[in-house]
Amino acid sequence: MKELLKLGVYTLLGTLLLSAPFAGLGMLSTHLVTEKTFWIQLIALFLSAVSLQGLWLNPSKGLCPWTYVDILPLSLLGLILLSYPYSIHPEPEKLLFIGQMVVLWYLLRQVFHEYPVLIGYFSMFFIATGLIEAIWGFRQLQGWAYSNHSLFRLTGSFFNPGPYSGYLAITLPVALGILLEQSKRNMPYYLSMGCIGTAIVVLPAGMSRSAWIAVVVSCAWVYALYRLDRKQAATRLRQHKRWYIIGGILGGILLLGGSASLYTLKK
């Protein structure tokens, strides 16, 4: 009974955490930024309290095993701390928030270690939020809904197109991964297809070059993980080495040209 109750609490807190893009408490002036940040911090605080209490009362499950991926958040935090301009100290609150997000990463890793069943649920809920955001943005582009910025037509539930495009960019590879996992057409398949289709339609209108690059790189990586046979690829590379070299050179030229075009896009 205690385990079921704890699972329910984790499910509720995770659902509230993933609902952060739509959070609005109606009490803070800069509600589109501050309220979302405060919402994440509040839910993360409750999540850490529940997780620490669970480890204290039931230490048998232990801490989650570390992988090479777990080094990345700490590495990113270290890089940010080293490159931060302490002389002018422009945004100390962002340093605090980034540190909190690193702690949240390890909290979620511990939650998934204790209850792996939540991975599927949280993934599907995350994709659903991406689908809602994409539909929201499409309605704004068509003039059926107001944006949150007078200078931009497309913002979703965010303040400007930058974070909105970034949010869509992180939902796309997750949706693609779940889509490639499905052996039959079921609810996760159609939900992932809907998220990918609507996000691809809306994302170019955000004019976010970093989001476009992130989508291409991350989706290519996800596709390679699920569909690329390394041994077969190595065999083909040895058999058609010349053509792969030519293709690599042409691809590099196209990449440089595309990068230059993206750089000058907003000038």
Please give the residue ranges for each predicted region.
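Active-site pocket-lining segment
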Residues: 114
